[in-house]
A protein has these predicted regions:
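Positively charged, small/polar-rich N-terminal and surface patches that mediate targeting and assembly
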Residues: 1-105
Length: 105
């Protein structure tokens, strides 16, 4: 049951250049975001329109990081992506969140 003091839980997906993996994982750990899963990918997009829209290159080897934490910690980390990792610039990465209302197992 969610109380007024409890925080929302969100899942963040982070896609970036593979060479940034260690720096991103260190930053996540420093931000106390510990529940993460790392996967490798290749390229961001296949169509010219989406490539142009997001400024991504097809030939980049990527790292995909999935994290689950509180919305407060994730929002602070998203700000850190802008200031330290320049995610507001083209060809750096994409990060987005999805709220998690409940988890069943």
């Amino acid at each position: 049951m969610k109380t007024e003091e409890s925080e929302s839980i969100v899942m963040m997906t982070l896609i970036a250049k593979r060479e940034e993996k260690d720096n991103l994982l260190s930053a996540l750990s420093e931000s106390e975001i510990h529940l993460s899963n790392v996967s490798y990918g290749r390229g961001f997009v296949r169509t010219g329109y989406v490539k142009f829209s997001f400024g991504m290159s097809r030939d980049v080897r990527t790292v995909i990081i999935f994290c689950v934490s509180t919305d407060t910690k994730i929002n602070k980390f998203l700000d850190r992506l802008l200031t330290e990792f320049n995610f507001d610039k083209p060809h750096t990465g994409i990060a987005y969140t999805i709220p998690i209302n409940s988890i069943s197992y």
